[in-house]
Amino acid sequence: MNRNDVTEKIITVKVSKGIQWADVAKKVGLSKEWTTAACLGQMTLDDKQAKVIGKIFGLTAEEQKWLQVVPYKGSLPTPVPTDPLIYRWYEVVSVYGTTIKELIHEEFGDGIMSAIDFSMDIQRQADPKGDRVNVVLSGKFLPYKTY
């Protein structure tokens, strides 16, 4: 048993029971974005959160413990993602990454955008030409220090 096994079980139960991530998030009391990342093995749950997830997905006590182990974050199965939706994000960074970097440095100076002190919001945006995906990423700016 490992964290990947627990993630696979969560996905299997989600599909078989028709569970929605937003409903899981409401029960956990956190955002749908963070909760989904946690259920997919990318975040660490505390004991209380793991018990709520365990109840929703029928996890054993051992499986709930795995949800509390710090995961290997950013662990995709291949170096370049092959899933079309995930690949589009790879493409966005490939095409616009240098632009994003330049504009952040111009606005804030030399540093990085945190993915730790971070939030994300994903919403549907109605558009007569076809609905759009609106993604807002908000990360604390962390300047490099001199020493």
Swiss-Prot record:
Where along the sequence do coiled-coil regions lie? none
Biological process terms in GO annotation: cyanate metabolic process
Listed SUPFAM superfamilies: Cyanase C-terminal domain (SSF55234), lambda repressor-like DNA-binding domains (SSF47413)
User: Does the keyword section mention Lyase?
Assistant: yes
Q: Where is the active site?
A: 88, 91, 114
Question: Which GO molecular function terms does the record list?
Answer: cyanate hydratase activity; DNA binding
Q: Which family does it belong to?
A: Belongs to the cyanase family.
Recorded protein name is: Cyanate hydratase
**Gene name in the database record:** cynS
